[in-house]
Amino acid sequence: MGWSLTAPTLPGGSEWVQKDTISISNNQLDVTGTVFCARLADQGFALKIVETRTFHLTNPNFTDFYKTYHRCDVAGVTGEAYTESHFGNSGSTKTYYFTGIAAAGASIKVVVGVKVDTATQEISFTAPALLGPTVYIKVGGAWKQASAVYVKSSGAWKEGQLKINVGGAWK
């Protein structure tokens, strides 16, 4: 869990979905970042931020001065900030990844920016649906989507795992 420069492995049925693009400009640099989200197993999710920086002046210290700043807040809980001191050459692109836990429909806020002058932009969206089969239960004559399946075991209700037999194989 947390920030990385290594892409997580997406499970079958999951894909990167673009959420938004940010753009930050000042008199020394332009930052453009595209934010993607994907669902991982269980309640896990992943973010991908593809960021490009263009420096207007040729001062090599700008790549160290304008630090990368990323943060992911889930369900109103402020996440730990990720900062990186050296971005790379002007015009280069870098990809950052974040993995975390969020229930389907939970609020996710991604903060992308430049730490030195606190120039940031925020993107908010809801966590994607969980992977796996959708189960419907008839309640009062109407079919409703089940958010979880519970099984009574030894007098206590426990969340169960739903499996289906497809062509003789349990999935």
Placement of each model-derived feature along the sequence:
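Polar, enzyme-active/binding microenvironments
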Residues: 1-143, 147-149, 154-170
